[in-house]
């Protein structure tokens, strides 16, 4: 029942009725009256269908919100169990531990709110920790988190210490997270097939829109515009669906202040965008205004591709920094376990052990370790030193887990145990990421292939339509048959060519954004994918124009 779901998503029945149901009902009544008074035919049916969407959205909101909260819990469960386990080996009592988890909203997201609920039950309502866990286990949106709370309640009742329970739960919860992650990757494969099918179908629809005006009394520009509009809607829906299904797994850090690498990438972005703007002005002014003979011979598709080429520079620099960040992540677990074991064995502070480790080679991470040692040796603020270390690596995972380690040792936890927990879970996350990168690379290859396939389909159809239009224009058609033959003005046909190429540019934009959305990397790399897809589309389009012009002897504007 919907009333049973409302408390689980933090809504009171009264608030739900006033904020969602009542406005939807009033808006629906208004649209029904409007539809019957001012519209008729198909337009009336469309207007009368809108109230169904509004009422369906109001009734389905609690279920959508419940699923959203479940997704937010499951995608951060690995961070939660790692931080919970690491902090449990400190000198904090259970209440202080829950209070600390409840304020980590940036790291834990919805799980911080779930921890706050347990803390409120224990602190303000004087409930036992086991009873509070059982109470929340029956109300949390995530069954995985609910099972974890049930197990924790049982272990506490049986007299087991919390840190012992959490040490044993690390593998269990991480395996559950791995299952959740792998299911998301499997759904990504399904979305890949859906994406290919949808783009292929829309391409044929645009092709039909090009040919149909010769057979039916429809305007060319209108048909192609409608087809492109539908194409854009489908692209947005697919991107939104994929974005909601993918787990939160970003690569880049979330620091407030830009690092040296961030400033470097921003500099290259400004340079590449500036060169693109300059090249666009020079090339298009020279072709269409100055009408330079050399540029007039070059198809407009290649002119646009040349103008967009400088964007590859900014994208390539970001991709190179991404690869360095990934290498840093691969070296981080080994460094942290070495540091924790060294500190535990010597029984001393972190500074001496870190100074020794800085002499070893940890790949690209070594430079950041030297900077960390230099900050810690000043002995001003150790917490900020570790925080800046995480930001300087530009890795979200290193930022997250290095701060966990620092917090544990600061609160009196055993550095060796903390480093082993973090290092083990870190490696599991890296293994899952490798699978994701492989899937995303396959998806990117499909998108590159589709960009060429779309260009071939659209411009081959355009060549056929241009040939038919030229044939109709050259015939001496009797006046009685003029209404049966549809001829397009040459200027309109050139405009349709630009619209089709614009469709390919929109596809390149959406696909390049989608690639970086899926792999969680720096969005500046999408410039490299965009420029590459533009070149593929342009070359295929130009070659297709030349072939159709040669085979069909069609006059296709360049």
From Swiss-Prot:
Membrane topology according to the record: Multi-pass membrane protein
Stored InterPro entries: ArlJ-like, T2SS_GspF_dom
Entry's localization field: Cell membrane; Archaeal flagellum
GO cellular component: archaeal-type flagellum; plasma membrane
Primary residence: membrane
Source domain of life: Archaea
Spans traversing the lipid bilayer: 17-37, 45-65, 196-216, 220-240, 269-289, 298-318, 443-463, 495-515, 527-547
Keywords: Archaeal flagellum, Cell membrane, Membrane, Transmembrane, Transmembrane helix
Family: To M.jannaschii FlaJ.
Designated name of the protein: Flagella accessory protein J
Organism: Methanococcus voltae
């Amino acid at each position: 029942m919907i009333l049973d779901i409302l408390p689980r998503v933090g809504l009171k029945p009264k608030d739900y009725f006033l904020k969602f149901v009542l406005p939807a009902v009033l808006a629906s009544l208004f649209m029904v009256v409007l539809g019957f008074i001012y519209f008729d035919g198909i337009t009336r049916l469309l207007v009368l269908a809108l109230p169904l969407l509004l009422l369906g959205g109001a009734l389905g909101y609690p279920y959508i919100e419940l699923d959203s909260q479940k997704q937010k819990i499951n995608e951060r469960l690995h961070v939660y169990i790692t931080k919970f386990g690491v902090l449990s080996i400190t000198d904090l009592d259970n209440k202080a531990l829950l209070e600390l988890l409840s304020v980590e909203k940036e790291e834990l997201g919805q799980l911080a709110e779930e921890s706050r609920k347990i803390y409120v039950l224990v602190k303000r309502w004087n409930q036992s920790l086991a009873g509070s866990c059982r109470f929340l286990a029956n109300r949390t949106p995530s069954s995985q988190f609910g099972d974890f709370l049930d197990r924790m309640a049982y272990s506490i009742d049986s007299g087991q210490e919390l840190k012992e329970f959490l040490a044993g739960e690390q593998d269990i919860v991480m395996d559950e997270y791995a299952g959740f992650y792998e299911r998301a990757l499997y759904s990504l494969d399904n979305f890949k097939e859906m994406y290919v099918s949808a783009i292929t179908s829309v391409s044929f629809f645009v092709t039909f829109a090009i040919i149909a005006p010769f057979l039916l009394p429809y305007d060319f520009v209108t048909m192609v515009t409608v087809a492109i509009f539908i194409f854009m809607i489908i692209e947005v829906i697919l991107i939104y669906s994929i974005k909601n299904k993918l787990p939160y797994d970003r690569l880049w850090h979330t620091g407030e202040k830009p690092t040296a690498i961030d400033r470097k990438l921003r500099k290259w972005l400004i340079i590449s965008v500036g060169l693109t703007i300059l090249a666009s002005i020079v090339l298009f002014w020279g072709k269409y205004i100055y009408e330079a003979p050399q540029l007039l011979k070059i198809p407009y598709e290649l002119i646009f591709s040349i103008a967009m080429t400088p964007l590859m520079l900014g994208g390539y620099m970001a991709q190179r920094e991404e690869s360095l960040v990934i290498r840093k992540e691969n070296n981080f677990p080994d460094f942290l376990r070495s540091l924790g074991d060294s500190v535990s064995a010597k029984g001393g502070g972190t500074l001496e052990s870190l100074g020794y480790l800085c002499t070893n080679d940890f790949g690209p991470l070594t430079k950041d370790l030297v900077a960390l040692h230099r900050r810690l040796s000043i002995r001003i603020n150790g917490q900020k030193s570790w925080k800046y270390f995480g930001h300087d690596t530009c890795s979200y995972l290193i930022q997250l887990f290095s701060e966990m380690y620092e917090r544990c040792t600061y609160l009196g936890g055993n550095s060796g145990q903390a480093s082993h927990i973090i290092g083990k879970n870190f490696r599991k996350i890296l293994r899952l990421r490798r699978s994701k990168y492989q899937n995303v690379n396959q998806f990117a290859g499909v998108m590159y292939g589709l960009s060429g396939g779309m260009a071939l389909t659209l411009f081959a159809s355009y060549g056929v339509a241009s040939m038919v239009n030229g044939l109709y224009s050259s015939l001496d058609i009797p006046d009685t048959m003029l209404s049966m033959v549809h001829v397009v003005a040459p200027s309109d046909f050139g405009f349709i060519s630009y619209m089709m190429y614009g469709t390919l540019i929109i596809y390149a934009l959406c696909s390049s954004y989608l690639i970086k959305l899926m792999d969680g990397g720096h969005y500046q790399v999408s410039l490299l994918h965009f420029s590459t897809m533009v070149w593929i589309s342009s070359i295929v389009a130009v070659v297709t124009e030349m072939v159709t012009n040669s085979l069909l002897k069609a006059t296709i504007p360049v």
